[in-house]
Amino acid sequence: MAGHDVQYGKHRTRRSFSRIKEVLDLPNLIEIQTDSFKAFLDHGLKEVFEDVLPISNFTDTMELEFVGYEIKEPKYTLEEARIHDASYSAPIFVTFRLINKETSEIKTQEVFFGDFPIMTEMGTFIINGGERIIVSQLVRSPGVYFNDKVDKNGKVGYGSTVIPNRGAWLELESDSKDITYTRIDRTRKIPFTTLVRALGFSGDDEIFDIFGDSELVRNTVEKDIHKNPMDSRTDEALKEIYERLRPGEPKTAESSRSLLVARFFDPRRYDLAAVGRYKINKKLNVKTRLLNQTIAEPLVDPETGEILVEAGTIMTRSVIESIESHLDGDLNKIVYIPNDAAVVTEPVVLQKFKVIAPTDPDRVVTIIGNANPDDKVRTVTPADILAEMSYFLNLAEGLGRVDDIDHLGNRRIRAVGELLANQVRLGLSRMERNVRERMSVQDNEVLTPQQIINIRPVTAAVKEFFGSSQLSQFMDQHNPLSELSHKRRLSALGPGGLTRDRAGYEVRDVHYTHYGRMCPIETPEGPNIGLINNLSSYGHLNKYGFVQTPYRKVDRETGVVTNEIVWLTADEEDEYTVAQANSRLNEDGTFAEKIVMGRHQGVNQEYPANIVDYMDVSPKQVVAVATACIPFLENDDSNRALMGANMQRQAVPLINPQAPYVGTGMEYQAAHDSGAAVIAQYDGKVTYADADKVEVRREDGSLDVYHIQKFRRSNSGTAYNQRTLVKVGDVVEKGDFIADGPSMENGEMALGQNPIVAYMTWEGYNFEDAVIMSERLVKDDVYTSVHLEEYESETRDTKLGPEEITREIPNVGEDALKDLDEMGIIRIGAEVKEGDILVGKVTPKGEKDLSAEERLLHAIFGDKSREVRDTSLRVPHGADGVVRDVKIFTRVNGDELQSGVNMLVRVYIAQKRKIKVGDKMAGRHGNKGVVSRIVPVEDMPYLPDGTPVDIMLNPLGVPSRMNIGQVMELHLGMAARTLGIHIATPVFDGASSEDLWSTVKEAGMDSDAKTILYDGRTGEPFDNRVSVGVMYMIKLHHMVDDKLHARSVGPYSTVTQQPLGGKAQFGGQRFGEMEVWALEAYGASNVLQEILTYKSDDINGRLKAYEAITKGKPIPKPGVPESFRVLVKELQSLGLDMRVLDEDDQEVELRDLDEGMDEDVIHVDDLEKAREKAAQEAKAAFEAEEAEKATKAEATEEAAEQE
């Protein structure tokens, strides 16, 4: 038997084919989230407060100090926060001390500082009831960077930039005339010597003394002449810098000094952060710069006078290590005193060495180091600036090397804790201004911290970050793997990062430093490729945010590969040679071969075993978790592996999932750390277990209660359902599974099923990657999933009175109300179809002035006779199912609702979706396809033992795509099924072809692993033998039920009157410009006419056509489409007199936009007509009046006569 048995958890044993001993367990896979947030609460938040405070007022008579803070218990539990659409957050109280310096009075007070979202154990946040994740960001590390550039004449020039965490950039560059310039904060350039003079080293001889004599320095000094003898060189330099930074303002040396101090030397305005100081000290340190250079002067111990290194010695690593303590101490330290007019007048300490130029043995080059300022110095120092200039000048002499900005030593990760700290800092600095003003304005005697602190800027900054930042994302909750993957995601986008359009090819490409740190495979296809990455399985962040990866140390003396683990960043790894994890070892731990495959600074080749420093801990340390779940990954093309890794994240949780027969051994750890399962927190014994809760009695007698979630709606509308795994009496240890989560079986990730798959064509139905499927998979609910959708209805106060939830809905028959309770809300368990009422609701209609009788009726019969309209919540199209739950929120019950809302009802509908034609299926190797036909079991091809095949795939999908892993999996899966075992074949260390064939032989299969298949319809065998086996197939989230859509009559857009688009709006299919061309080209005039009129925006025409169709009459001629009227109105709005005439030259009346609204709007030419009309009307009215008077007069006369 090939392979050996490995136990995964308590419920599963797999036969593993790995040959490499694992010396290091995988770290907790979500520690990047949890550790970062913990660090933020422990010391990050405190540091932010200490950065911004103390705050003094403008006259410096009062000061506000930070004392400490305390985080209290969260207001809601996790479950309550989810139900109430609230955030899972804890109140934070900060203690401040207000010191009045005039009276020495001190007031200490605790101030409520808002609610702070708290991370759950799963590494997520609950914000307004939704589960969110803060994605870690990959950004350029602060530090000093050097680059080279070639101009159009082929001349190589150099550039350098000091990039702080926040503050102004300082750049150096040389031009074609070999003059070196500096730029401050992207302004116009000035000779670099101007900045040196401003720092207090004004004489040319001083400049040559510091930097040594080189062409670049000479040319620049010649360019930088003393223009104004009235000013000293330093003052002149300061004025010149001020002119560049503030053009047009009156320049004085004093204002320039304060400006430069504010720009570079004020910790509030300029911050390198700990990582920036570390990177600058590392880059400008003399140790790295002296490496492999020939020293030109003897190095002498300043205390004893002993010669440590003779002149002419090559400074190898061993020589540098022997004098390391002296290099870190006072060796060759020189103190320069700036003149009194300088920006910073403190003495500048530098380390100065002379080496022989690599390009010219007769020349001596000066190396200036920054003498390692303390880690606490977070601003740039004059020593840093001079050392940077020295490094820059050395580059032209062939010393030092330029930086690669895509190297992971120069890119770091801002995890959730740091991102949050930055937001809080932003809020506090906004608050600071506010506090200063209040301190100055109000009466000092009565002030307390509470009165001067306004917490709104801080809470607003935090709220905005969680609610709308690009890095705060709605958790991808399709299945546990997608959750895990989302928590480990690294994004180069977001505030302070790159943008999609600006990111070039280099940033996106795989870099050699990604090895063991970022997965080279798992990244999205499309515009984000390479900008969104995933942490490799063993990746870990150090305190500066650089990704480390573990290696086994090799003892160079004995050649033994030890089990000592060393975590290295990309920078550190560059100094060593690393052997691959699959290098063969002897029993005693030495390398079995003299030559091993290894890497050094990105060069992959064979190296002598005796120069190897480290060895990989595991073959899977290269890839991310999702990629490590693909068996036979080493046999797949990388593009297909990328799709395979991404598609596993889109798997839908099935009703009864199966773990794969052929796994990689990663399934257990992924399920365990995903946060979707229930894991024992302590050792103990199960005393109670059912579907809703499990109770575990600890050894000390205390009781742990674990609640099991049943059919909760996940973020992506799938059923989040946990299943209890333990029974009463079981003994559990810390870390054991108590319940499986969704897409898990026996404590292992189980995204799909293990159907029997045959590679064969069948009636052409699997053309173009389509999948033919047996009806068994439908009947036996093999690929059935449950989906939950949430619908809500709220009642508000309107101007005409409150809306009401009721059973009494106008014009609705009793049969439509049969499942509503007495309140008018659907009962749980009711089966509902499209259009059924879920919540009966009525809204008051506008009422006319009531007559006396109507008012009387109102008084007698109450409000029943009032006019209301039906605004009930109904089941939308495509959403029929069973009512799973109803939640009612009212003010009376103490629920927090939005203002104006009196009651909120949420209805959850569960749908059971079986697999059907049009659903998307996939394997783990990027082999995806759509179900094209579901064939009755009796018609499917069957094996010689009578077992029908479940799925038929097209064999043409394999060769061109080069994902051969699927075929290996197929054969090994069949052997596993026959032997009744589960198999683990870890990536890059899995089953070899010998293992595969020996297992196939052990299972009693044919030597080519193929078989004869019989046609289920005729019983005849097919002509050729077919590859049949078991392949792990998953159903993806792209389901036909979510996409299928049809419309007859539906909503129309207000302005254009054309049908809306999209399934969500119940829209129509767009018949665009090109489609119209097609009909025109065919000359299909009648079809074209009805598409542009009845079926689109001819308002009267479509009504008449609908009426004619329903009454069976002939359809009348179409009218004018609405879009034509829109065109006419647009031309009229441009001031053109546009009218439409029919064939009899009569003007055609067009519908007005607001019927009846613009009766008083008159066309210019119609004004005369209107005037004439008005005059005629007035004349007629006058005549009528006269006639009336005459008749009245006659009548009176007649009456008089009669009397």
From Swiss-Prot:
One of the GO biological process terms: DNA-templated transcription
EC top class, as a word: transferase
A GO molecular-function annotation: DNA-directed RNA polymerase activity
UniProt region (Disordered), positions on chain: 1174-1203
NCBIfam families assigned to the protein according to its UniProt record, in alphabetical order: PRK00405.1 (NF001616), rpoB (TIGR02013)
Family: Belongs to the RNA polymerase beta chain family.
Protein name as catalogued: DNA-directed RNA polymerase subunit beta
Organism from which the protein derives: Streptococcus pneumoniae serotype 4 (strain ATCC BAA-334 / TIGR4)
